[in-house]
């Protein structure tokens, strides 16, 4: 879902090309790893999105989010100017630390080139200045982010096979078949590394904290925007304690109703159950109002997937992210606990967009 946050930047950059043409997302395409873990420059937008819960020696959990975006501008390749970018690289990083009480986050944006910013094909290798995510030959990821006020140096190691979303990786995002992406997830990544936490008084703490934990990585690429009547979306990626993995999302229309919805639940035996738009429901339980933007977010929700109901409660309420300096959106994105029938069953990340403002995603 997240690459659509790049739409505002992409549309603004379209001055470099009057009629850009991008590769189409079509059903029946076979995702091949590790080759498809790399960049797909022919498509309009792409992103690598890692989220997770971290355990610390003081038993105070943290949440983290790291995202790298690639956005094609449609720049005419016949223009020899090195300063007219064909690709933009954008990065977000955030740390949810209850001791701080609000989200610590940072963002970067740069044109691809000069070895300072790139997204390479064939294998995950994305860099923006000193921020990077690299997939090693054994499939694990090395992530380095030295941000304003905090840092994340993490290794993410697969413990399960990738989960192809939708129809073998072809993931519908709206009523028209071209409103789709190629999309796979890697749930239950084992996390090791160090985190420098933000200091409560500002700046950052001096010493790194050794952490372990579990993460979820999404990789998605597309050339189409959401339907023009879309207001925003709600997305969930959950690592469940029994080894299962749950992904669910809904696209909200301007009338408040779900325009599209989908969910996939893979059990610990590897069997996948999918749920269509009429089987998925997000229902607010409690809202929190941002003191900065006055936006009410449904930070506690129930999510129904068929006959199953999941309760989501945040690690902390204030996980609002302001990305107006890069992708142009303000939204809520944070660590949540997952329960069923009052029992703790997992850890997840929840993304809530279009509550501060309707997404200005343009028209196809």
Can you name each region flagged by the protein language model?
Residues 3-14:
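Bacterial N-terminal signal peptides
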Residues 18-364:
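Structured soluble/peripheral alpha/beta segments that form catalytic or ligand/cofactor-binding pockets
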